[in-house]
Curated annotation (Swiss-Prot):
Keywords attached to this entry: Acyltransferase, Amino-acid biosynthesis, Arginine biosynthesis, Cytoplasm, Transferase
Enzyme class: transferase
Domain of life of the native organism: Bacteria
Native source species: Actinobacillus pleuropneumoniae serotype 7 (strain AP76)
Name this protein carries in UniProt: Amino-acid acetyltransferase
GO MF terms held by the record: L-glutamate N-acetyltransferase activity
Amino acid sequence: MRNTELVQWFRQSTPYVNMHREKTFVIMLDGNAIAHPNFINITNDISLLHSLGIKLVIVFGARCQIDELLAKNQMSSTYHKHIRITDSKTLEVVKQAVGGLHYDIFSRLSLRLPNSPVLNVVSSNAVLAQPLGVIDGVDYGLSGKIRRINIEAIQQQLAQDAIVVIGPIAPSVTGEMFNLPFEEIATQIAIKLKADKLIGFCDQQGILDSEGNVLSDLHPREAKRYLTQFIESGQYHHSAARFLQAAIEACHAGIKRSHLLSYKEDGSLLQELFSRDGIGTQLSEESSENIRLATSFDIPGLLNLIRPLEEQGILVKRSREQLEMEISNYTIIERDGIVIACAALNHYPQEKMAEMACVAVHPDYRDSSRGDVLLEAIKRRAYKLQVEKLFVLTTRTTQWFQERGFVLSTTDDLPKEKREHYNYQRMSKILILDLGQ
């Protein structure tokens, strides 16, 4: 990364640093993620999150390590409904695998980065288990499910600035140990903690569409369709499918956002959390984008958006004072709290006309439909004001407006006040849309 790119990335990430501080994230790591060479980078990034004031719970699984140890001991496993049936001999292997991963995670997180403090990493026995029992005539043995979670104990550890690590085995009230699906543990802890995010590291960069492109945002309703595809194609064993199911459940239970990332790509955690569009798949009941009327708090974001366009001569220069006086005229699109598009509606009630002005879209989003979204929002505001004609003055985007029904006009068609202040040096094209009211 060149110095200029580093500076730009660091500046763009600053709002997210402030946004995430003091928030609680639950991170799911399966055995494949821990075994991968990139795991050391993942733990370094987790340490960085902790240094930024983020509260972290790590829940890990050990399926691939368990399978390797079973094969080494010439043992095999039986599954029913994607759950391992655990007998007493298998449980000994499970405990061995989980213990080894516990050590690996603690040792990696204990590696100090230069000029950084030693992390307080703790193991938690906050999960109490109970047997799954007999289902469909199948005895699951020592495979279990959650009976209770001592969420207060986890909260106390987080309050003491600790990273909490929890594995996939837990005791019962009778003292027996049970093998639990770690995705279930992570999901339920996130729900009971009222965590801000559930993050899963899986074997691909989120959820992919039919052409192999990453879906950056998914509503749980859409996510269910992809989960069904995983199941019907016999791919539920993939971590992406299991994590997707966990994310859907978490979203339905009130977790605002869940993220699916690849454990294979260096820096995926940081790119997902500290950039506008991320790198993996985000699940949310609500869109990360919001269109609304601007307030005075949006002025710094508006200035950042329109200043480059003013310097290029695309927009007329506006002072901060002018924006403050006219802020109620503006409609904005924000993404993760950052203004990425705007437009103003200046009303001329005597002529029943209005101007769509100061139309700006962030460069990263100009190939999308944000301009159309803004236009529709401005038209809705105009209808409420009983505006009959909407006009724009533009030097660069004449065709775009013509494609949407605007017709080239002259200064004679402008409201009197606007006509008197028309800038003949800029020679902006005048286009008018008949709203048919």
